[in-house]
Amino acid sequence: MSRNILFISVQTIKDRTGLHNNVDDKLINPEILTAQDMYILPALGTGLYERLQTGIQDQDLTNDEATLLDTYITPCLVYFVMSELPMGLSYQFYNKGMIRKTGEGQENPSASDMIDVADRYKSRAEFYKQRLVKYLKEKSGTNIFPLYNLSLIHI
């Protein structure tokens, strides 16, 4: 269940990628939440996912949870968000329908170009997701992330 608690900030994405600072945060935040729900939740399992959300909200993450979030989840999520952004930033809905944003004096990428960019970032994200899952599996024999171990039973 999504509680609108983001694992990363818009600024984190801007700091780690080529995303320009003038991109409106309101256009990025929904993509963060969507990427968390679509890609991170299945990797973590519901129990661990919700525990991290609660830990962020209550500011009581353990050191192991903070390491998981900072070292493994953040890079994965950054690139999943970047893989979702090309279409989300180029096409927007207004009261007259969907339009494609264009800028004067600029060459607009084709839909094929945007798909190529999205695929590039998704490839990076999949690398980091595999690393995240490997880390969690390595720790599954310990009691560091018991909620992850419980979620494995229900998969």
What is each residue range found by the language model?
Residues 1-74, 88-96, 100-153:
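Conserved short "hinge" loops at termini or chain/domain junctions
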Residues 77:
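Catalytic-loop motifs flanking and including active-site residues across diverse enzymes
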Residues 84-85:
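Ordered, amphipathic secondary-structure segments that act as subunit-interaction surfaces
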